[in-house]
């Protein structure tokens, strides 16, 4: 079933990044019940989703019988695979930041894209002010779209601030672009050089 929340609100942003592409091999890390993978499927010949939660993977298998869906951690994914697209929607903050970014670089094919809809910790005055200013917009969006608040996924509090994420990305994924989004999220896009 379709649903809307502060994470799926950014699925159109991800789809815009791959418009015009086809035949992609995609990996969705923290795929949950597979809604993003389903939306990516017209652009992909290979769909792989991983999630540590067995019940989420079971729901994803019902949604996407043609996809490879695995109950496992990103750290355990074999490095002999490679992908044109790696997505992480509200999952990067569940993992160790720098080792995860290094692993993404290993798994991305030349010209491949890494797209993140992420959560960051509020550590500075600016972080708190921007978060407070987002409340009205987020509340209106939630009401208009009838937000599905509990879709049965694990939650974790983010550890790194946006400034810390920017620093790590600049070091490990040179050229990565990061911007704040609404709904308390940031967007990261990176394309590995061809």
Predicted regions, residues:
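Conserved beta-strand/loop positions that form the S-adenosyl-L-methionine
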Residues: 29
């Amino acid at each position: 079933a379709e649903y809307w929340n502060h994470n799926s609100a950014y699925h159109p942003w991800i789809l815009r990044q791959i418009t015009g592409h086809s035949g992609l091999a995609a990996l969705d890390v923290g795929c949950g019940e597979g809604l993003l993978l389903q939306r990516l499927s017209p652009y992909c010949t290979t769909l792989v989703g991983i999630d540590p939660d067995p019940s989420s993977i079971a729901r994803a298998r019902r949604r996407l019988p043609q996809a490879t869906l695995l109950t496992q951690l990103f750290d355990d994914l074999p490095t002999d695979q490679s992908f044109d697209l790696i997505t992480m929607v509200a999952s990067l903050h569940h993992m160790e930041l720098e080792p995860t970014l290094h692993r993404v670089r290993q798994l991305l094919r030349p010209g491949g894209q890494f797209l993140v809809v992420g959560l960051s910790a509020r550590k500075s005055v600016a972080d708190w002010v921007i978060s407070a200013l987002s409340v009205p917009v987020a509340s209106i969006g939630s009401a208009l779209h009838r937000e599905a608040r509990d879709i049965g996924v694990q939650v974790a509090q983010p550890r790194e601030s946006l400034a810390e994420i920017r620093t790590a990305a600049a070091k490990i994924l040179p050229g990565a672009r990061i911007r704040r989004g609404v709904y308390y999220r940031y967007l990261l896009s990176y394309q590995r050089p061809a």
